[in-house]
């Protein structure tokens, strides 16, 4: 960890030096631009009586120099934008390594209380696991990462391939930071893939064959007219008339062009900004299969994706010139600019529209690997779990910890082998660590399914669908009580098991909404049914009677506990998992200490 922190701090210092260098060049170029204006104005003033050849040439040279310097100035400003983005990226890494989540995106729109596990494991929201792991550079990558968290591919071969890709991307630190920085420079606009797919089926919006022919004939017409004018065969008024005629023709199409431009900007503007990201993907050399396959999808017989997306960006930028009134008049009067660009965009879409969805899929998948590669790099002591297919075990780990708990506060525990059709029952006092332990298992199991490293010394697991029941809530909108909401989740588990699914189940204090006897009877019956259906999992409870199942279901149910120690007036927790059934409870002790009940209260009072 210290090595990683030193690396980021070193990069931050180097980036600061580069920022200062770029600022210096920007100031120099600004001074040169001003100097060109001042010198040109001075020469014009001093030689104003020398004839139009002298001061006219000076003005022309001054304009060329000024515009050239403006282009150079713009490039340096883009470089500064890039290094500023890189500065923010590195600062974000340092903040997250120190578990500071202020201002970090939590993906709140992905929160779904009905999902199999995401709500229980706090995957999304403020200070969530998504905040911790998300390093995506694009809006489409961000959505793809949420899909990976919610619906990971559980095929063993796929997980192993993802592990290879994550490991390889963890070695490309410069690439990852630059990729994220260019993504940050491209903006956060959402790429509407559904709208893009609809573009493929929309009618062509080109201007027709006659107007298209006219667009390409206009430059030749003007050249001929200018040549005739220079020889005195045509009056200048003819050229002016043609200019006005073409301007009127452009005006007739202006409303249609504006409508098409707005539609294309909504659907394609974000994609056009990603040309540099595609270029980075295409130029890198990859060893592992997943990254190589993604890269191969960026090139075909028609050229590379980056070239075609760059062409799109160029066309959209050209069309934006129409918003300048002078530019609109000159460009359309001489070149029928709007119609020329609309026809070019129509041809571009005709050639590429059906491929855009594939490009976005490639970019989003690659972005997820960059994100997980950063996670791997940031935590070099995390390990890739071993994957089993025979469910022996479904889950086992040594020194398993919760990645969202800082290292100095984290207490790691071993997880005994959980084989098929077996359950571990965790008993313990309030605040002893049961719920945190369940979430620790859930988060690391999910990381393993995603192909990411886990917070453990070692871990072995069989990828199965994960289902949790750690929290439930009343729903006034659905006229649903807490207890009924919990029953519905338990019903989902049972129905899926009856359909033959194999699940990894994590439950916390089931049937909390009923009386003790009813709860105990229902809990015992549920665990027997889950074991009988071949499910595997872990259940935390305060009900010590559930521990007796280990006697009636030997080899199928095992007991573990978190203990609280009461020494005099102090309550302490070790947060260490131990075999057996809990012996100490702390509710009355805490109620006495907080003055809720009398300090001399006892059950005999």
Segments and roles (model prediction):
Residues 1-429, 436-466, 488-489:
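Alpha-helical coupling/stalk and coiled-coil linker elements that connect catalytic or binding modules
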């Amino acid at each position: 960890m210290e090595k990683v922190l030193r690396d980021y701090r070193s990069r931050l210092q180097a980036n600061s030096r580069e920022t200062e260098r770029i600022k210096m060049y920007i100031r120099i170029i600004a001074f040169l631009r001003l100097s060109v204006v001042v010198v040109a104005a001075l020469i014009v003033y001093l030689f104003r009586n020398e004839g139009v050849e002298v001061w006219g040439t000076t003005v022309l040279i001054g304009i060329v120099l000024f515009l050239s310097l403006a282009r150079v100035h713009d490039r340096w400003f883009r470089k500064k934008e890039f290094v500023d983005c890189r500065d923010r990226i590195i600062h974000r890494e340092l903040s997250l390594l120190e578990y500071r989540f202020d201002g970090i995106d939590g993906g709140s729109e992905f929160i779904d209380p009905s999902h199999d596990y995401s709500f229980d494991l706090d995957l999304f929201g403020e200070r969530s696991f998504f905040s911790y792991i998300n390093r995506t550079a694009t809006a489409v990558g961000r959505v793809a990462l949420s899909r990976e968290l919610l619906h990971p591919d559980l095929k063993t071969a796929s997980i192993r391939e993802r592990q290879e890709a994550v490991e390889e991307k963890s070695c490309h630190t410069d690439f990852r930071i630059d990729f994220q920085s260019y993504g940050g420079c491209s903006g956060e606009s959402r790429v509407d893939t559904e709208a893009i797919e609809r573009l493929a089926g929309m009618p062509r919006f080109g201007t027709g064959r006659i107007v298209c022919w006219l667009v390409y004939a206009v430059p030749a017409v003007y050249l001929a007219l200018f040549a005739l004018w220079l020889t005195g065969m045509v009056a200048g008024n003819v050229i002016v008339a043609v200019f006005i005629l073409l301007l009127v023709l452009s005006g007739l199409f202006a409303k249609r062009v504006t409508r098409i431009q707005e539609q294309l900007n909504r659907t394609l503007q974000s994609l056009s900004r990603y040309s540099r990201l595609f270029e980075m993907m295409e130029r890198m050399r990859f060893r592992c299969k997943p990254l190589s396959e993604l890269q191969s999808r960026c090139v075909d017989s028609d050229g590379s994706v980056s070239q075609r997306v760059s062409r799109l960006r160029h066309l959209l930028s050209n069309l934006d010139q129409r918003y300048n009134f002078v530019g609109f008049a000159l460009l359309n009067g001489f070149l029928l600019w709007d119609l020329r660009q609309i026809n070019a965009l129509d041809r571009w879409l005709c050639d590429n529209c059906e491929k855009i969805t594939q490009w976005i899929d490639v970019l989003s998948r690659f972005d997820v690997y960059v994100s997980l590669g950063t996670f791997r790099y940031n935590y070099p002591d995390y390990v890739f779990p071993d994957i089993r297919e025979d469910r022996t075990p479904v889950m086992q780990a040594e020194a398993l910890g919760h990645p969202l708990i800082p290292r100095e506060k984290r207490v790691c525990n071993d997880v005994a082998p959980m084989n098929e059709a077996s359950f571990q029952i965790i008993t313990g006092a309030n605040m002893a660590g049961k719920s945190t332990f369940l979430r620790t298992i859930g988060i690391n199991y999910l990381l393993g399914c995603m192909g990411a490293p886990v917070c453990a010394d070692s871990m072995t697991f069989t990828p199965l669908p994960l289902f949790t029941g750690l929290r439930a809530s009343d729903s006034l909108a659905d006229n649903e009580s807490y207890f009924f909401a919990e029953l519905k989740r338990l019903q989902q588990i049972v129905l899926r098991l009856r359909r033959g699914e194999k699940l990894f189940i994590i439950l916390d204090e089931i049937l909390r909404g009923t009386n003790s006897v009813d709860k105990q009877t229902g809990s015992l019956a549920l665990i027997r049914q889950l074991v009988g259906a071949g499910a595997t999992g872990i259940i935390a409870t305060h009900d010590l009677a559930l521990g007796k199942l280990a006697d009636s279901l030997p080899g199928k149910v095992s007991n573990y506990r978190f203990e609280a120690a009461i020494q005099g007036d102090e309550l302490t927790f070790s947060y260490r998992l131990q075999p057996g059934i809990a012996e100490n409870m702390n509710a009355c002790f805490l109620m006495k200490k907080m003055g809720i009940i009398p300090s001399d209260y006892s059950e005999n009072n």
